[in-house]
C-alpha cells in the first residue's frame, strides 16, 4: 500500500528509460519510508540488494556484504579484506549480466552504517562508480540511509571523486496531514479529521509510527499501548532514533533537551548556556546535522539578522517524548488517557498545533491563494517590560505565531488556535 509519493515514484520510474547508468541517493529522516519507496519503484529490477548493519565492525560489514552477494547468486568467494576488494567482487558479479536496454538495479540500504572508521569505504564506492559502473549504460545504483547528514556530507556535497556524480537526489519528506488521512482511510481506522490531527501532532508524518495504530482502537488507546505499556512498539524509540542517526549523539541530545525546555526556541548563545555545551566545531556540526535531519529549524524573526537566528525543536515525536513519555515517571500504562483534559495536555496541544501549521506552510499559502508568490516565513514576539523597582508590568508581551513575508509587498499575519474550531483536512 503506497500512499502519496507520486512525484518521487515518477522520478524513480523515469530513470528506467534513461540512456545512461544512474547514481541515485534517497535520503530522509529515519522511518520515513525510504526503503519501502525504493522497493515499490524497482521491485522487478533488482539484481543486488544489501543493507548495512548498525554498529558492526568493518570485518562484520564486509562479511555481510559477501553474504548478500552469495544470496544474489554470485556463489562462494573469498572473504574480502577491504572495501576495494568487496566492490571488485560486486563488479565481477555484475559482469555476469550482459549489457542490455533494460535497467538493472543495485540497492545498498543504510549505507552510512557501512562507513566504519579508517575503512576507506567512500573512496572505494567512488572507484566502483567512476571506474566501473558508470561505464555501462544499464545500471541504476541506489544508495539510501537515515543518517541524512552523512549522505549530504559524503555523497551529495562530496568534493572528491563523487563530486557531481549523483544523477538523481530524492529527499523523502514526512507525510502531510492529507496523506496521513489517506493512510487512515486505507487502513479503515475510522478516525475523524480531528483525531487524525491529534495523532499527527505526536507522530508527525512518519509512516512507520502510523503503522502501529490498530483498527478498533481510539487514538488514546493506541497511544497508551505503543508509548506507555510494556512491550509497546515505540517505548524505546527515542534512544534508538538518535543513536542510529549520529555516531556520537551526546551533543545532539543535549541540544534537543535544551530546546525542549524552550518551545519558542533559543538563539545560539542561549542554547549554549542552557545545554552547557562548549562553543566549538562539534557544537556547530551537531546543530547543522539536526537541521539537515529535520529535527530542528533555524529561522530569524522579521527584521533580524542571520546571526540572531533562533533554533527551534520541531520534530513532533521528540517533543511528544519530552512532554509525556519522559514525564511518565510512575510507569502509568494509561498515561496518555489519564492526561486528557489536563493542563499539560492543553498546553502541549496548543504548541503542537502551531508546529503542524508551520509544517504545512505550502498548503496554507495555497489555501490563501498566493502559492506562486515567493515568500519567507518568520515569527514575532515582544517580551513586554516591567518596572525594575516594583516588578509591575508596564507593557504586556505579545506574539504572532507566523508571519509570511511576500515578494508582492504584503505580509500575512497568522495565529493558530485549536479552541472552538471545526477542523477539516482538505
Locations of the language-model features?
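Phosphate-binding site recognition
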Residues: 1-338
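A cross-kingdom feature that marks ATP-driven nucleic-acid transaction machinery
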Residues: 302, 309-426
